[in-house]
UniProtKB/Swiss-Prot annotation:
It comes from Natranaerobius thermophilus (strain ATCC BAA-1301 / DSM 18059 / JW/NM-WN-LF). FMN binds at residues 21, 45-46, 99, 127, 165, 191, 217, 243-244, 265-266. One of its GO terms (biological process) is 'de novo' pyrimidine nucleobase biosynthetic process. Heterotetramer of 2 PyrK and 2 PyrD type B subunits. This is Dihydroorotate dehydrogenase B (NAD(+)), catalytic subunit.
Amino acid sequence: MADLKVNFAGIPMKNPVASASGTFGFGFEYQSVISPHELGALVVKGLTLSPKRGNQGTRLHETASGLLNSIGLENPGIDNFINEILPDLRQCDATTLINISGGNDEEYVEITQKLNNCQGIAGLEVNISCPNIREGGLVYGVDPELTYRLVSKVRQSTSFPVIVKLSPNVTDITEIAKACERAGADGLSLINTVAGMAIDIDQKEPVFDNISAGLSGPAIKPIALKAVYQVSQAVDLPVMGMGGIYNYQDAIEFILAGATSVALGTVNFAEPTAAKSIIQGIDNYLEREGYLSVNDIRGLAWK
């Protein structure tokens, strides 16, 4: 058996496979088929300062090779999570990353400070695909200066490892990655969903009330793979790669492209036990190819 352990942003992981935020709930929903303890890391669904009910109308829409979602960050809020969910989550003995979102810098900082004294947390994943209400709705993750300012404030507010989740909806994702590095981020996760939409030809109107939705699944894998390939060479930060991973071969591609770890998202809906087969598949691949550790193949596809 090969050594599957990795160190991602100072966080020891027993294997390189994590759950992607928003697709695995808080882990409890999948316990009948897979324990969060079996994952390299559990990344919980995104949390905001106050509870959110999410978007009205259609939330999910299948495409030919993926899934469009417009959930609207439905979540119980950070206080309810800390008081009611985290105590039970600790019992899972999982390496847990907390995904956080906010409408302005202060909200991100306040959420971070509320988590600082909590036990059972391995790190924070900062979702910068949120619109900044004080910057006319401009999404943090498309502007290097906004990204730098926000990540700097979060970094200064906690001793937890800070991982920043990057949006693909930018001209040059490496510029955003470099801003995160300058701000003191410990690691990066990429990519978030790709902006898209669908139209109901019978109603002759957009499927989603918000018009735009996030595309995930196999359709975005080539986009995600290229982003990981570019970013992992542009900065000296570990990368958690995600976007369309459905089998161990996909996961291996991301690691060869430079990812230290990978995260599974949409596949969890189609095949809840996918993580088990992907972890085993990575192990089998390493043995077959003669590698002692998964770390030995990281970035081998670089040219």
